[in-house]
């Protein structure tokens, strides 16, 4: 493809070092699609005849079929997916294959391929995010009015609905989907026609190329177009953040499934055992999901580090963009269905969750009681803090303090102060949009349902 200027053969180790076919071969669909579109433009501008165009398109479709059914045979000389396709095309249709690359560089060719591939990955990952959202939503709809302790700093804080906690993991995934959709808008910019750096001398219709390939715009600057990998960095950031959200869900599920909590039992299908301890049932699905966050962050850092310090236009360093990209996509395309399955088959235990509720979690409600009767919140906070300390010193629950202690705490306290110690009442009082009251959560469920149905 490029050997005419050289007097010596490439060193065998250098050839191995330079070769990317082992990993970029997965872009065969995109490479062939781009080449078919390019062949049509070559015919439109008169570089090849209609007959030659048809020969090239037919040949490329034959190469496509060989890849699709696993018959494609690679050669040691296949430096990358582009050379592999062109080499096989030449074997099938003869010397006319040599005209296909007219006016095109591998610089704009690979930039086009990887954008097309990334757009496909975004669609697949969005589908899997939606499936995980659906699993969380189904559990939330089933949970009804079940209560659980809400935690901050992993300390008991306030009672919340189980459904509210489940949906707390739904909305980060919705933001992930929105970020990916936004990333897709910038990814769908066509570099083809930019050549190596200065643009092609052929008056191809780049807008028509973009339309044929499902792109929404053409790149405005050829130098930028062949070196722009912003979309990969952006995709990898989205992937790393998805990993972080999966890690948070996993951490909660791991903790809540432990014997010390007992809030949820994971299905056998998403658990493993111990080679030594017969009694063990380990939450390996969620532990691996938690671990993948580090891998996804590593993929992002690898690409950002590679991009730092590059001069403008194309450099071979950019070949290093694909393995982190492919790895991140592969990781999520497996991790997300595992997460969805593990969530969908998990069995929650509302009775154990309610048993874990503690009267001290209603201390804020007691402060609210005082505030409703005109006591400044900071003073109310201090008063309730003293009552909590009094209960701790007596070794009793906050609600078990004698009524006289509450009445003596502040003149506004009346016997009805003990009504504060009702977990269901506490939850029901938090009715603002986004809060944990049943009516607020029902509206949240309806909103979440619209999100998954609208795709």
From Swiss-Prot:
Entry-linked InterPro entries: Arg_succ_lyase_C, Argininosuccinate_lyase, Fumarase/histidase_N, Fumarate_lyase_CS, Fumarate_lyase_fam, Fumarate_lyase_N, L-Aspartase-like
Domain of life: Bacteria
Keyword entries, A-Z: Amino-acid biosynthesis, Arginine biosynthesis, Cytoplasm, Lyase
Pathway: Amino-acid biosynthesis; L-arginine biosynthesis; L-arginine from L-ornithine and carbamoyl phosphate: step 3/3
Keyword DNA damage set for record: no
Coiled-coil segments: none
Catalytic activity entry: 2-(N(omega)-L-arginino)succinate = fumarate + L-arginine
Enzyme class: lyase
Protein name from the UniProt record: Argininosuccinate lyase
Species of provenance: Roseiflexus sp. (strain RS-1)
Native organism taxonomy: Bacteria, Bacillati, Chloroflexota, Chloroflexia, Chloroflexales
């Amino acid at each position: 493809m490029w050997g005419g200027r050289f007097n010596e053969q490439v060193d065998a180790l250098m050839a191995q070092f330079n070769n990317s076919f082992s990993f970029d071969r997965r872009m065969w669909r995109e490479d062939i699609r781009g080449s078919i579109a390019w062949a049509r433009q070559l015919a439109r501008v008169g570089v090849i005849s209609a007959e030659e165009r048809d020969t090239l398109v037919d040949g490329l479709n034959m190469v496509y079929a060989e890849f699709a059914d696993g018959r494609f045979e690679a050669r040691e000389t296949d430096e990358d997916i582009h050379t592999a396709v062109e080499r096989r095309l030449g074997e099938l249709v003869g010397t006319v294959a040599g005209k296909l690359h007219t006016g095109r560089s591998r610089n704009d060719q690979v930039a086009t391929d990887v954008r097309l591939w990334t757009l496909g990955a975004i669609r697949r990952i969005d589908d899997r995010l939606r499936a995980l959202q659906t699993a969380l939503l189904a559990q939330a709809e089933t949970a009804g009015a079940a209560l659980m302790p809400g935690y901050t700093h992993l300390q008991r804080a306030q009672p919340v609905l189980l459904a509210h906690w489940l949906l707390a993991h739904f909305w980060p995934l919705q933001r992930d989907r929105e970020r990916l959709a936004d990333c897709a808008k910038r990814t769908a910019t066509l570099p083809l026609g930019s050549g190596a750096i200065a643009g092609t001398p052929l008056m191809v219709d780049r807008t028509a190329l973009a339309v044929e390939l499902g792109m929404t715009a053409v790149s405005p600057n050829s130098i930028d177009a062949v070196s722009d990998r912003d979309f990969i960095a952006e995709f990898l950031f989205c992937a790393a953040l998805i990993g972080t959200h999966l890690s948070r869900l996993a951490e909660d599920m791991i903790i809540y499934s432990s014997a010390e909590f007992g809030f949820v039992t994971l299905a056998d299908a998403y658990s493993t055992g111990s080679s030594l301890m017969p009694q063990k049932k380990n939450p390996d699905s969620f532990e691996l999901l938690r671990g993948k966050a580090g891998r996804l962050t590593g993929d992002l850092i690898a690409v950002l580090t590679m991009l730092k310090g590059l001069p403008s236009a194309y450099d071979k360093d950019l070949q290093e963009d694909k393995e982190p990209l492919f790895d991140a996509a592969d990781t999520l395309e497996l991790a997300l269905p595992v997460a969805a399955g593990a969530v969908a088959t998990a069995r929650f235990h509302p009775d154990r969750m309610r048993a874990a509720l503690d009267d001290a979690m209603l201390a804020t409600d007691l402060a609210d009681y005082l505030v409703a009767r005109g006591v400044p919140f900071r003073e109310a906070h201090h008063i309730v803090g003293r009552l909590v300390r009094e209960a701790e010193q007596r070794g009793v629950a906050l609600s078990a303090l004698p009524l006289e202690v509450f009445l003596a705490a502040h003149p506004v306290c009346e016997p009805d102060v003990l009504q504060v110690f009702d977990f269901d009442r506490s939850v029901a009082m938090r009715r603002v949009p986004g809060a944990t009251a049943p009516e607020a959560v029902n509206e949240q469920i309806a909103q979440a349902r619209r999100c998954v149905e609208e795709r």
